[in-house]
Design a protein with these regions (language model features):
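Membrane-anchoring alpha-helices and their flanking helix-loop junctions
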Residues: 1-237, 253-325, 339-340, 345-346, ...
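A conserved hydrophobic position in a structured secondary element of the catalytic/binding core
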Residues: 213, 245, 378
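A short amphipathic helical element positioned immediately N-terminal to and/or at the very start
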Residues: 236-244
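Short, cysteine/histidine-rich loop/knuckle motifs that typically chelate Zn2+
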Residues: 334
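Structural alpha/beta surface segment adjacent to cysteine/selenocysteine redox centers
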Residues: 341-412, 417
């Protein structure tokens, strides 16, 4: 009886990997964070392995000799097994081994099996280069994500990895599946005029900024991530959440719809519509119930005033909360312009306070103090936070300005233009009239006639700093 090696490789890669994954799962019986870590490790590898396959085919590391059941030229069975073996399996089987050792085990496994998969996998002379890059960009980050999730460590780091993984799933894997199922083709962006590409990039950036800012808010204000098994510890009602309840879901739906239009593929746009119905159906009901159970009346009050999918024009503020405070130096030229600009606008839940009156320390930059939980922020980030108290348009500008790379570059420009840090000494306890609440003041102005202690540099330069 003749057995086709081609079929053995394709069937074996799927069933052996699936059985191994199931066996490790039954052995470890992961729950809670261990379950979440294993799933996230697999999620990371879904876009990463597919991208590695495309790079390998283009650079000659290896190629696939297969027909039927393909996703971007990669057999789906090989694709899924690879994602399992580099994702969930090592995360569950070797949770405490050094990651270098885990990578060495995976390398030994591939050295034995990849040449044996010759009927399907054709290895090039430099395939070990691709193997090393795959271990570095697929396996190792997925194991870091799993371990940080299990140990509740490196919140910012695991949030960044989650964003990369889910962005790859949303903008790469899901469109590839939709196009593959519909038997249509990718539209080559090179065929578009430059002005069209520029326009589409800018359009796609709008929902992307909203989604990224929402994740940032979960990390900085909520102490958690968007993953249901790794949620924020605090109810997040600031940033994009002050305008709409589901900014991340809204961002994903709009991104898929725009991507479908860009690719001229209705199936990709339809995936966005399906994601919307799923989010408003079972997922939305389950999430709302969980939030109601965890946060009680605070959640109910928030959900009553903030819509799930249609943003407000003005930010929501909990009744009775004290206003956030923006500390601005009274005797500072550049800062005075910032102070005056905010005083002329109708902000909600924001008070401008002389920096000289800070209760605990001498400030060196404009400083924003949030109304609820969260740490103070300074400089460009403080101004960006204050913009969120105006209206949706200015809030979006603030969200874009707060993104890490953008914030760093903007602060660099400010510092290079004369806005470097400068110490503002504490002078006295402010009189109530020295604090301007922008909740009700439309055209208020801070007038503080009391003397302020200034540094020697202030007296010499008389200029302001952000």
């Amino acid at each position: 009886m003749h057995i086709d090696p081609y079929l053995v490789v394709r069937a074996g890669s799927l069933y052996v990997a699936a059985l191994l994954t199931a066996a490790v799962w039954m052995w470890r019986r992961p729950a809670g964070r261990a379950f979440s870590g294993a799933v996230l490790a697999w999620f990371w590898n879904l876009p990463a392995v597919l991208a590695l396959h495309l790079a390998a085919a283009r650079l000659g590391w290896w190629s696939m000799n297969a027909e039927g059941g393909l996703l971007l030229g990669m057999p789906v069975d090989v694709y899924l097994s690879w994602a399992w073996l580099w994702g969930a399996v090592p995360a569950l089987a070797f949770p405490s081994l050094p990651i270098v050792v885990v990578a060495a085990i995976a390398l030994a496994f591939d050295l034995a099996l990849m040449p044996a998969a010759a009927p399907v996998l054709r290895l090039g002379p430099d395939w070990l280069v691709g193997e090393g890059i795959g271990l570095a960009l697929c396996l190792i980050p997925s194991q870091l994500l799993a371990r940080w999730t299990v140990r509740d460590a490196r919140l910012a780091g695991r949030a960044v990895l989650q964003v990369i993984a889910f962005s790859g799933l949303l903008l790469f894997v899901l469109p590839a599946v939709a196009i593959g199922v519909s038997d249509s083709a990718w539209l080559n962006p090179v065929d578009r005029p430059v002005w069209q590409l520029s326009l589409w990039v800018q359009l796609l950036l709008v929902p992307a900024i909203v989604g990224l800012s929402a994740v940032q808010e979960f990390v900085t204000r909520g102490g958690g991530t968007p993953v249901p098994f790794d949620p924020p510890q605090q109810l997040v009602v600031t940033g994009p959440y002050a305008y709409v309840r589901n900014p991340m879901q809204l961002s994903a739906v709009v991104l898929l719809a725009l991507l479908g239009l860009f690719l001229r593929n209705p199936w990709v746009a339809a995936a966005g519509v399906m994601a919307h119905f799923y989010s408003t159906g079972i997922a939305g009901w389950d999430e709302d119930e969980d939030l109601r159970r965890r946060f009680g009346d605070n959640w109910l009050a928030y959900a009553r005033d903030v819509r799930a999918w249609v943003p407000r024009l003005r930010p929501w503020r909990r009744e009775g909360d004290r206003p956030a405070r923006l500390f601005v130096a009274s005797g500072c030229g550049m800062c005075s312009e910032v102070r005056g600009w905010f005083a002329r606008h109708d902000a909600r839940g924001l008070a401008i306070v002389p920096a000289e009156t800070h209760e605990s320390r001498a400030l060196t930059r404009i400083t924003f103090e949030p109304a609820g939980s969260g740490s103070e922020v300074t400089g460009v980030e403080a101004v960006a936070r204050a913009l969120e108290h105006l209206h949706l348009g200015w809030a979006f500008a603030g969200w874009a300005l707060r993104l890490p790379g953008v914030r760093w570059f903007a602060q660099l420009l400010i510092d290079a233009s004369g806005g470097e840090p400068r110490r503002i000494e504490i002078s006295h306890v402010p009189h109530p009239s020295a604090i301007v609440s922008l909740d009700t003041a439309v055209s208020a102005r801070i007038e503080d006639s009391r003397p302020v202690l200034r540094t020697r540099r202030d007296r010499q330069q008389g200029s302001g700093r952000l």
